[in-house]
Amino acid sequence: MNKFVSQSTIDTFFDGEHADPFSVLGMHETSNGIEVRVLLPDAEKVFVLSKETKNVLCELLRVDERGFFAGVVPNTHSFFAYQLEVYWGNEAQVIEDPYAFHPMINELDNWLLAEGSHKRPYEILGAHFTECDNVAGVNFRLWAPNAKRVSVVGDFNYWDGRRHPMRFHQSSGIWELFLPKVSLGQLYKFELLDCHNQLRLKADPYAFSSQLRPDTASQIGALPEIVSMTEKRRKANQADQPISIYEVHLGSWRRNLENNFWLDYDQIAEELIPYVKDMGFTHIELLPLSEFPFDGSWGYQPIGLYSPTSRFGTAEGFKRLVNKAHKAGINVILDWVPGHFPSDTHGLVAFDGTALYEHADPKEGYHQDWNTLIYNYGRHEVKNYLASNALYWMERFGLDGIRVDAVASMIYRDYSREDGQWIPNQYGGRENLEAIEFLKQTNHLLGTEIPGVVSIAEESTSFAGVTHPPYEGGLGFHFKWNMGWMNDTLSYMKKDPIYRQHHHSQMTFGMVYQYSENFILPLSHDEVVHGKCSLLGKMPGDAWQKFANLRAYYGYMWGYPGKKLLFMGNEFAQGREWNYQESLDWYLLDEFHGGGWHKAIQDYVRDLNHIYQKNAPLFELDTDPQGFEWLVVDDYQNSVFVFERRSKKDERIIVVSNFTPVLRQNYRFGVNIAGEYLEILNSDAQQYMGSNSTNTSKIVTEDIESHNKAQSISIDIPPLATVYLKLHKVKKVRKMRKTSKVEDTAVKTEKKIAKGKTTRTKKTVADTVSEATEVKPKKTVTKRAVVKKVKNEESAVFPNAEVIAESTSVENNVS
């Protein structure tokens, strides 16, 4: 029996059960004098050195053969700085004693973390490079309030949980240990003795880097430097700006042609950014990049929320990709998944033996559709963990926004559940009040800490006020995916044109609720997987009709109010469904493989985007009813739709769509403004592999009443096509002795335009939200093309979108 520490106490260390290592290990003042006690399994000898003089002060006694050493430092009556000289066989090593260092978490951080109100807990928890008493090392911290013992294990201690048990802060439930001389890139985990005396090996929830699957360790990485938001990036996110989003899965956009392996972040950036810029997209939206164990989840089942996936390289590489996008004038949005997490044992499930991050009751905590677990939003520490993660991605990588996945599954307790499978809220309702409050708090946090960051909801129900400010009962998002519009219009487009007349309202119904929220029109990855066919595959008819239908649909979509989102591959009409394990079918753009069809639709989408960006009527008043008017809404027999878009300066663009394969010659419809109109886009143009039924000359209004308008125009509407007509020149209308109210209104509007006056737009929902936040393949059968590819591009009607946009300036300050 030794005179230093009881054998039973020593046994608890080697049994991995001691909960308070600092009460035993390190330097202690005792009746014997100043004692030093160390736990060094497999060591043979240990000497105490003066840190100042490097002299040996004493040799510690090996009081337990398993590696527990203790001894009294002679002639010493106060604490001093020391090091340990350790002999491992014939090798000697001078080391710092981790148990010689004081606690490093301050009282304020400890209190805020306990309260769950720390804005940036990732700056405290996890693994951080720091200095303590002029010694460099890594400070490890973990929240596990119900664990009996926690140790940090890794490359640096042979993954032995006995060697480095951590200090416990009772008030916050946080465990802490400073380890000197631990270096960047080393692997680590936390070993927990849970409340049921079971050992659990967990990855760090706050790790900045993680191993590539199937390995599961965390990796010591530096906290990325802050990237400031710029005014240019902030402006590009506003509701009155053109927003055309290219949705990308980095693992399958392009792959290495030789081995079908992923490209890294830098290789992707070299190809993706110039492509997106050339195609005219304003934003890139990336499918989730937080580390995830299962490739087939596409990132939507993350475990390492703070770790950019190592599939494509390092966090620094990802940061360079984002920076390259910004230099090209492209904003970057990240899909973010705070709704659920997988049940992999190294993750958050039963973290300390209790349902720490999830609900204990599966009626609340288990997502049966995805076999995942649902976060407990009623727990402050969990909300803090999630909300700060959104801030981390925006602030530390310079991202410009988040798209929150599966919001409906978060805000409804009965989501995808039968009666008896869910628990009502405190008022007996189906709403998840805690999740709703979490979303409000997260949007508020982002808005106050990084004004200008955009927050987008994928919300598939009619929950009211998603993009309204919290003080109006809203969730505080800036935009919401318009799933209703997408489902209705795709349902319409899939029908044979002969039947479309019976479903006319599917293309118009969206306007009934258009201004209830700020909408994004999404043609996302979800629409081209799981047997749903590609977008091209959804279109009816032969090959020519399929492409014509898709071009007409895109034109209708780009003209319709709402920001745009298109999943990769749809810009060139990939024929098969998306496969996350393979690259997109880029070979279709070759003349030999694609016959020019796919290249033509790629050119069309490029022109659409550039025309969209350069014409304010197509985007400026997306959230204001004054920016839109139906001109022909009820011609179901011909499946024709005509509407007008307007800008803040009252510029006008008329969008005309014909969803039958019949040429509508001399089709007359009424317009608001008398004058000359130019055709600036025609999806049936020869260069897009259309039939080339175009309106090449100026289109002049006539004093013929039509559709309750005094003025009208007559044009040829191509088959299965969309046409854009831009007001080019205003014509003065001679006043008759007797005029209708419609004519009076038209004349007044023309006078305003002629004088350069602008319409006064009311405050949009997006403006209000901005203020508030300051606080699833079928084979495509290709038939013989009806129209041959144009060999001589000079004979095409529209050389390119930029020339079109520049050559259609409106006289008299109209454009």
From Swiss-Prot:
Swiss-Prot/TrEMBL GO biological process terms: glycogen biosynthetic process
Keywords in alphabetical order: Carbohydrate metabolism, Glycogen biosynthesis, Glycogen metabolism, Glycosyltransferase, Transferase
A matching Pfam family: CBM_48
Annotated GO CC locations: cytosol
Active site positions, chain numbering: 405 (nucleophile), 458 (proton donor)
SUPFAM superfamilies, sorted: (Trans)glycosidases, E set domains, Glycosyl hydrolase domain
Catalytic activity, as annotated: Transfers a segment of a (1->4)-alpha-D-glucan chain to a primary hydroxy group in a similar glucan chain
Metabolic or biological pathway: Glycan biosynthesis; glycogen biosynthesis
GO molecular function, one term: 1,4-alpha-glucan branching enzyme activity
EC number(s) given by UniProt: 2.4.1.18
InterPro entries linked: A-amylase/branching_C (IPR006048), Branching_enzy (IPR037439), GlgB (IPR006407), GlgB_N (IPR054169), GlgB_N_E_set_prok (IPR044143), Glyco_hydro_13_cat_dom (IPR006047), Glyco_hydro_13_N (IPR004193), Glyco_hydro_b (IPR013780)
Highest taxon in the source lineage: Bacteria
Family: Belongs to the glycosyl hydrolase 13 family. GlgB subfamily.
Subunit-structure text: Monomer.
PANTHER family attached to this UniProt entry: 1,4-ALPHA-GLUCAN-BRANCHING ENZYME
Summary of the function given for this chain in its UniProt record: Catalyzes the formation of the alpha-1,6-glucosidic linkages in glycogen by scission of a 1,4-alpha-linked oligosaccharide from growing alpha-1,4-glucan chains and the subsequent attachment of the oligosaccharide to the alpha-1,6 position.
HAMAP family documented for this protein: GlgB (MF_00685)
Protein name: 1,4-alpha-glucan branching enzyme GlgB
Gene: glgB
